[in-house]
Amino acid sequence: TEFAQITPANYDPIKWQERTNKEAWQLGCVTNYGSSEAREDFVEVIANYIVKPDAWWDNMLREAGDEGAAIIQQKWEICNTWLEEKWEIDLDALRDEVQKRQQNLDWEMIMNLEFLNGK
């Protein structure tokens, strides 16, 4: 796929765990786990874009440097287009909704749920 061909030499299914996230960012991946293979990278781009706040995403792009940030942006564009064309999902609208809901979570209630406390 087009996505897999962007940084094929940067994927390492064995040594990805030794990379820091910053090293992965500089290689054009949004997480060190995403640098393990293209399929994981694809999902990590989408998942992290949806759940991480703007400050995290902006910091990642800044720390990635010009080359890493350009690669991440290229990957994001592919993910965004794919979701829109294949699933009719507006990634920005989905992210906005997830971000809004995350702000309104009652963490105290969630942490007190019986299944989380092993009961």
Predicted ranges, named:
Residues 1-119:
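Active-site-flanking segments in enzyme catalytic domains
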